[in-house]
Amino acid sequence: MQERIFKIDRELLKRYADASGDQNPIHQDEAFAKSVGLPDVIAHGMLTMGLVGQFVSDWAGGSANVKEYSARFVKPVVVPANTVVDLVVNGVATEENGLYRLELTATVDGLKVLGMAKALVKK
C-alpha cells in the first residue's frame, strides 16, 4: 500500500467542528486546551479516524468495499497555531479468500496516533 499524507491545520479543525457539531473547545481554543492539561489544541479523534478511513476506502475502490474498520486512539494529534501537521498513513494488505486484511499505521512526527488500526475490504 502506498503511503499517503493528510494535512491537518486549525482551519480543517474548524471545518470539521462545524460539520460534525463537535464544538468541544479542546479542538479550537488553545487556552482552554492547555487549561485541561493538553499541550495545545488537538484534532478530533473521529477526524483522524475518518482520514485513515478515507485511505482505506480509496485503496478498496470505494466505501462499499470496506467491510470492517477499527482503531484505537493512542495519542492525540496536536495542532499548534499557524502549523500544518502531517498525518502519515500506510499499511500492509494480506489477501484471504477474496478479502484483504489491512494492518494500518497512522503517525504524526513518527509517533503512532492510532493503535490496532485494521480493516477488512473486498477489492
Question: Positions of the model-derived regions?
Answer:
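Hydrophobic beta-strand-centered segment that forms part of the acyl-chain substrate-binding groove
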Residues: 36-39, 49-86, 116
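Intrinsically disordered, low-complexity segments enriched in polar/charged residues with Gly/Pro
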Residues: 12, 19-20, 63-64, 91-93
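Hydrophobic residues in beta-strands and at strand termini
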Residues: 8, 73, 121-123
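Catalytic strand-loop segment that frames the active site of acyl-thioester-processing enzymes
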Residues: 1-43
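HotDog/MaoC-like acyl-thioester-processing domains
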Residues: 1, 79-123
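Glycine-rich loops and low-complexity Gly/Arg-rich segments
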Residues: 27-33, 66-68, 95-98, 113-115
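Catalytic-loop motifs flanking and including active-site residues across diverse enzymes
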Residues: 44-48
